[in-house]
Regions:
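OB-fold ssDNA-binding interfaces and closely related basic DNA-contact patches used
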Residues: 1-42
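Generic structural hydrophobic/aromatic packing signal, biased to beta-strands
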Residues: 34-36, 53, 112
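Compositionally biased, intrinsically disordered low-complexity regions
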Residues: 13, 51, 62, 100, ...
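Short, compact, well-ordered microdomains
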Residues: 75-119
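Compositionally biased, intrinsically disordered low-complexity regions enriched in proline and serine
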Residues: 5, 11, 23, 49, ...
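Acidic, aromatic-enriched beta-alpha/helix-loop junctions
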Residues: 38-88, 92
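Hydrophobic transmembrane signal anchors and adjacent membrane-proximal interface regions, especially
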Residues: 3-6, 15, 68-71, 95-96, ...
């Protein structure tokens, strides 16, 4: 498991990469779960997002299943801040932003490719 720390004006964000094995998915035996969390003492138990991607040894990490990453970062007045999405864009991830949830407190975006070595 690898952890990357991102400092933002709204706190410290952690991007955690975990390997997993899904026996029910023989076509995808070595997926990675990408979990984003914010280290914020006001929300110590919040998990901010999970996306499963396929590991391709030739092309890197690819989302071949259409899974979506759901990321929330708390800012002023509890609003969500796209700091992690900006960091993912810088890392080379293909990120679509701007799709707000019905409650107006978040964004859902597809993660097509993620290059953690560039963070």
């Amino acid at each position: 498991m690898r952890t990357y720390t991102i400092e933002s004006p709204y706190g410290t964000l952690r991007l955690v990469l975990q390997t997993a094995s899904y026996a029910a998915m023989p076509h995808n035996p070595r997926p990675l779960a990408i979990v984003a969390r914010e280290e914020n003492p006001e929300y110590p138990d919040e998990t901010y997002g999970v996306v499963t991607v396929n590991m391709d040894p030739h092309t890197g990490l690819k989302d071949q299943t259409g899974d979506r990453a759901f990321v929330k970062t708390y800012g002023e007045n509890g609003h969500w801040v796209p700091e992690l999405m900006r960091q993912l864009e810088k890392s080379g991830a293909a990120v679509r932003t701007g799709r707000s949830l019905e409650n107006g407190r978040g964004v859902i975006f597809p993660l097509y490719e993620f290059k953690p070595e560039l963070l």
